[in-house]
Amino acid sequence: MPNVNRNGYDEYLKQHIPGAIFFDLDKNSDAKTDLPHMLPEASIWEEILSNLGISNDDRIIIYDNSDVLSSCRCWYNFLYFGHDPNLVGVLDGGLKKWILENKVVNSNKIKIQKSKYKSQENKNLVKNKNQIDLNINIKDFFVVDARSKERFEGKVPDPRKNVRSGSIPNSFCLPFKEILNEDNTFKKTEEISKKFIQIIDIKHNNIVFSCGSGVTACVLALAYSLVNNKYSPKIYYGSWAEYGKI
């Protein structure tokens, strides 16, 4: 994320939930583009998960040590590449809540036995810039932006270089922090529903989430799936880093 000077791997080595393996969102994104956090090719994803010892039938619980941002994006990546949605979840509140509840952490090294992971891309879960542009007029789907209202309305400079301020025409704004509690757990489904009802019909399944670089959009996508169990998360993965590029 822009303006964040942290080393996730160092934090992981210092303490983690017993048995947890480390996943680097930045390093495991597409290295062939200058856009941040773009999805890797399917063959690269297979290599990444195989090297981590993850199998297709594994139950995956994802957590992070931030505002659930990385864990929600990782959750989305697993779904995009075909992991069973019933086998992928996010630890509510992440490591911070885990530690506050005095649960066990350690710094033990994890021995990994390589697997042979096979991906199956679901390209219906992503939108590209051309599809976003076409939708401005035909309005086939709603675009909901997870950034702050100040960034959405162009009242503050974008934190990334060579990216203008503003938002996608005809999109809606729901800052992702509005569906989280102060401890970074998700609000109750009734409260989440109220937030979405203010801008869209929560029975609508054709919702595409956007943000700065395709990360916080996944927080909203997960939240929306909690109040609409028929929804499959859809992301404009280039997000404003691509759309607002100068």
What are the roles of these predicted feature ranges?
Residues M1-I246:
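Cytosolic catalytic domains that perform sulfur/thiol-centered chemistry
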